[in-house]
Amino acid sequence: MAKLLQFNEEALKSILKGVKTLAKAVKVTLGPKGRNVVINKGFGSPLSTKDGVTVAKEVVLKDKFENMGAQLVNQVAAKTSDVAGDGTTTAIVLAEAIYSAGVKNVAAGANPMSLKRGIDQAVETITRSLDHLSTPVNTAQEVRQIATISANNDGEIGRIIGEAMERVGKDGIITVAEAKGIETHVDYVEGMQFDKGYVSPYFITNAEQMSVELSNADILITDKKLSAAKDIIPVLEKIMEKGARPLLIIAEDIDGEALATLVVNKLKAGMTVCAVKAPGFGDRRKAMLQDIAILTGGKVVSEEVGLKLDEVGPEVLGRAKTIKVSKEETTIIDGAGQSNEVKSRLAQIKAELANASTSKYDKEKLEERLAKMVGGVAVVNVGAATETELKEKKARVEDALHATRAAVAQGIVPGGGVALLRAVKSLEKLQLTGDEAIGVTIIKQAAFAPAIAIANNCGKQGNLIAEKIYEATGSYGYDGLTDEFKDLLKAGVIDPVLVTKSALINAASIAGLLLTTAAMITDKPQPKSQPAGMPGMDGMGGMGMGGMGGMGGMGMM
């Protein structure tokens, strides 16, 4: 297939056009008075959103060279969203500002590689300064303020997320789901819960709620599949000798004679027992069984560690104060595990989370395990009157949740673009020369871009507002919602420092990459082929009626 090529200045200009088009679509959403963007995906109802990364993902340009620039900057939004969960619009605004200034300087004769070195050093200096500016999140009020701002100044969402985080703790997990009604509410789950219910309804103890409820129960945990009666009878006899406590059995699977034996003991011998399948699959199942064992003070009966069901007794059992089992899930509350062992297990899971090589999917599963271990799970059920409103509101809740987690993890800085304009003053210490010094100047100018965009969206002269913020000190800045200059930290206009740092780092990284581009290659568009006519149609032109003249001699005899 033939290719199209562009080189040097021509390539940089095509990229710039694509970057500017993308930024124009995204920039309008920034700040407290940012506008929504309506997206028609070609199916279902249109989506109205104020989420930068959602808008950026939908931008695909007709010109292939321009589209390459747009898609590369699109990665800025995606990466920032992955790391910090918010700040995607800020990242794109910064990327446009850095790249635009860089292209002008390259056109004027600056060396792109030297510019990039200066840009990288400037970004490193600013991120260190942002760390010094940040303050830890100390109060529930600050958590609510962060959530409110990230949810487009929706106080209800801020309150809900603030209360949820206060309830489940910083290690607890908060998930977002769609409610069946129009009200937004939070459901809390106490203890360790996993998505496996009873394997037989004969185990039910509460007929009204169709559930199994066990108090002060023993727990037998094994990774073995239980099918034959001989798999279960020896250990049951040893447990019964100890005393008739309620018993929960967690195994890979339970069926056949083994299940029948348990049901008969429940119905005829009056034994309070319930069996559930082990959660997860493969190595994750083994890890979760070990989590349950540590939390309840028991051991996983596994031949891998030299334990066989027919040889063990009550010493391998875990214990919990309350166990609730429904058709679809099991909840273990107040396990009897040793606190030092539980803390050690939590530290191990956190270490795996901190490992850079851990995939995003694995991190999500590790976070779930961490939350289950500490017994804190909250589900925010988002309600709305229409499907379009529901999608938009759910996206805002997810933004707010991510931003709040980032703030709790690393602290907060003044919002409204103020933090960058304070941190940029640290660049005065950098003693660079030539084109590297120009790279530093590019970052200094780009630091004004978020504050300018916020003020412009509020109907103000962005350049004047940003200059006034730069000349001030501390947390003094422009509150676009009230149209006032004030101490933004006290006013609750705050950003997680991780969001601000991630936006700058990712924007500078991709802009520097684009500046050093010397050639672009893409497929040449193929002309659309015309639909072919029916074969033989052209040859039918001679079949006029005159061709049938010879039939005149075929009169009736």
From Swiss-Prot:
Known EC number: 5.6.1.7
An annotated GO cellular component: cytoplasm
One Pfam match: Cpn60_TCP1
Gene Ontology process terms (BP): protein refolding
Leading EC class: isomerase
Subcellular location: Cytoplasm
Catalytic activity: ATP + H2O + a folded polypeptide = ADP + phosphate + an unfolded polypeptide
GO molecular function: ATP binding; ATP-dependent protein folding chaperone; isomerase activity; unfolded protein binding
Highest taxon above the source species: Bacteria
Residues that, per the record, bind ATP: T29, L30, G31, P32, K50, D86, G87, T88, T89, T90, G416, D495
Key words, A-Z: ATP-binding, Chaperone, Cytoplasm, Isomerase, Nucleotide-binding
Coiled coil (residue ranges): none
CDD domains with a match to the protein in the record: GroEL
Matching Gene3D superfamilies: GroEL (3.50.7.10), GroEL-like equatorial domain (1.10.560.10), TCP-1-like chaperonin intermediate domain (3.30.260.10)
Chief subcellular location: cytoplasm
Role of this protein: Together with its co-chaperonin GroES, plays an essential role in assisting protein folding. The GroEL-GroES system forms a nano-cage that allows encapsulation of the non-native substrate proteins and provides a physical environment optimized to promote and accelerate protein folding.
Quaternary organization: Forms a cylinder of 14 subunits composed of two heptameric rings stacked back-to-back. Interacts with the co-chaperonin GroES.
HAMAP family the record matches: CH60 (MF_00600)
Family to which this protein belongs: Belongs to the chaperonin (HSP60) family.
Protein name in UniProt: Chaperonin GroEL 1
Organism, scientific name: Protochlamydia amoebophila (strain UWE25)
Encoding gene, per UniProt annotation: groEL1
